[in-house]
Amino acid sequence: RLKKINPKLIYLSISGFGQNGPMSYKPAMDPVLQAFTGFMSENKGPDDIPHRTPVIIFDMTTALYATQLISTSLYARINEKFGRKIEISLMEAAAAMQSIRLMSGYMEGPYTHASSPSGTFKTKDGWIQIIVVKNHEFIKFCNAVGWKKFINDKRFVSNAKRRKHEAILSREVQKLFFKEKTDYWKNLLDNFEVQNEKVQNYKEFIESE
């Protein structure tokens, strides 16, 4: 009916699970898609419980994809005499956003850290996130925290071996980080060019320099 009024109309329709198929009738918002698409299973904490992120990540991702589709349709309409109907679902957007991890997870199984030590560690007054990937980065980390004895430790001489002994290494890092405040570790690691960052809330992020 709208097409008859304006043949060049671009119409966008967003659904939870698509316009067709066995789940097309179901209502769905972001938390439901976080559960359905495997995102929560990939977002487990040390307690091994799947966690939902309170950020409505798939709502926002769907909006971004929709904006791109509308933009390309508007561009195409310059040389066309007709508009189009665009259909997109939260499920499709969630799958597209996770495509790399989705395929590797399907082929290789549950997620394991790509590097070690890596993760979020509790400090004396907060939390800090670190990531150490390459061997020279591990050496920098050891020099920064005074772990010279671990540089040539056979358990930690390569990333593959560090991953194999991740539980031991992470436990040692946690024991160490709990001794000092976050800013102490941040400044120390920054001086040695080790990737790290304080876990901030929104207020801290907005007010950061």
What does each model-identified segment do?
Residues 94, 165, 204-208:
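Beta-rich nucleic-acid/ligand-interaction surfaces
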Residues 21, 161, 207-209:
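Short Asp/Glu-rich motifs
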Residues 108, 114, 202-209:
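Active-site-adjacent capping/gating segments
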Residues 117-196, 203:
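Aromatic-enriched alpha-helical interface/lid elements that frame and gate functional surfaces
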Residues 74-78, 177, 206:
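Hydrophobic residues in alpha-helical segments
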Residues 13, 198-199:
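General beta-strand structural signal in soluble alpha/beta enzymes
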Residues 3-128:
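Active-site-adjacent "lid/gating" segments in soluble enzymes
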Residues 91-93, 133, 199:
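Short, well-ordered beta-to-alpha junction loops that form the rim of enzyme active sites
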